[in-house]
Amino acid sequence: MSNIKTQDVPRVGFVSLGCPKATSDSEHILTRLRAEGYEISGSYDAADLVVVNTCGFIDAAVEESLDAIGEALAENGRVIVTGCLGAKDDVILAAHPQVLAVTGPHATEEVMQAVHRHLPKPHDPFSDLVPPQGIRLTPQHYAYLKISEGCNHRCTFCIIPSMRGDLVSRPIHDVMREAEALADAGVKELLVISQDTSAYGVDVKYRTGFWGGKPVKTRLYDLANALGELGIWIRMHYVYPYPSVDDLIPLMAEGKILPYLDVPFQHASPRILKAMKRPANAENVLERVRKWREICPDLTIRSTFITGFPGETEEDFEQLLQFLEAAQLDRVGAFAYSPVEGAAANDLPDAVPDEVREERRARLMDFQEDISTQRLEAKIGREMTVLVDDVDEEGALARSPGDAPEIDGLVVIPDGEGLAPGDFVRVRITDCDIHDLYAERVV
């Protein structure tokens, strides 16, 4: 029995879960759907079928994804599953055997083939159905720019390489073409993402490509330099702490890209870093952070850490707190270790009890709160350019160069008259709390 609706134009519903890399995958699939003449439905009822892009990184994400698939099946009945959890099709089919198809992550072609099988595409689609910048799930003034897929590292807590494969860098001319189209469409900020941003080009031995009639190496420094010519904000995420990252700091000091680094250090104890297979040394990191700030005093550093990793002792955790005190990071996120099916860390000895993992996470965040607040307080009295995200009757919400969307703080501007999302505005910082800055407009 078919549940296909009787409307003339086929409609596809879409549910996107997970990280910014998954969001980028969703945007590529949505762009293909629109290019082929499908309409995107905002409701289950109006859709002929539903695509669910899943996350499978931790147990909570698996549960959320399975729940989303179940909801789509209950409300619509015709569901195609893609994304990271799709790499474990046995898990999906055991829970929901009635799904139409399952693909892994970064699988636009496979998703489109499944859509074609179950919902034939309309005749004579027109390319002008799709804007040059493609279909996006983010607000109009910022966008994610994915530069590679997969990862060559084998961190013991992570299963991404088993789901997304080894590093595959996008050709630099493809990345720049997408970036230019986004800038031309009015995007004011590009957030550069991948599993391992600083490894860009390693897999192709930094092959030389061409952009704007000039040779450009497939390398993060060269890409950042080229992106900096677009005249919009460029923000770097998921930067593995390679020595080559040092080359980006002068570009930040010159104002070519934002003075912002999202570097997932994960821990500071040499013993735990070794167990994680993370090739970092806390003393070396501290020296590099010092040099980065010497070159670019306005640099904002965000990082994430895992507490309660197997084998972590109280001494290891204290080393992590000492690192935070010395590093004076601006923004920090912390996660209590959660076993992930298929991760090598599951086989490590000396598991830390759940309550200790969570207690250490809470202690870390309390400890870091004072540091982050002091870093914000140092900005009071300074003038800076901010990017407006939202405006209502109470004023405007914006972000500084040191604030990425959704994960960092905001700049609250009481006087939002005449402002709109995507506007740049000059402000003076007047106050702060533990997360956000407060500012007045500079006339």
From Swiss-Prot:
Residues 377-443 form the TRAM domain. Residues 137-375 form the Radical SAM core domain. Keywords: 4Fe-4S, Cytoplasm, Iron, Iron-sulfur, Metal-binding, S-adenosyl-L-methionine, Transferase. GO terms for molecular function: 4 iron, 4 sulfur cluster binding; aspartic acid methylthiotransferase activity; metal ion binding; protein methylthiotransferase activity. Binds 2 [4Fe-4S] clusters. One cluster is coordinated with 3 cysteines and an exchangeable S-adenosyl-L-methionine. [4Fe-4S] cluster 1 binds at residues 19, 55, 84. It is an enzyme of class 2 (transferase). Residues 10-120 form the MTTase N-terminal domain. Its cofactor is [4Fe-4S] cluster. The keyword Nucleotide-binding does not apply. It holds the Pfam family TRAM_2. Its EC number is 2.8.4.4. Belongs to the methylthiotransferase family. RimO subfamily. Catalyzes the methylthiolation of an aspartic acid residue of ribosomal protein uS12. This is Ribosomal protein uS12 methylthiotransferase RimO. It comes from Azoarcus sp. (strain BH72).
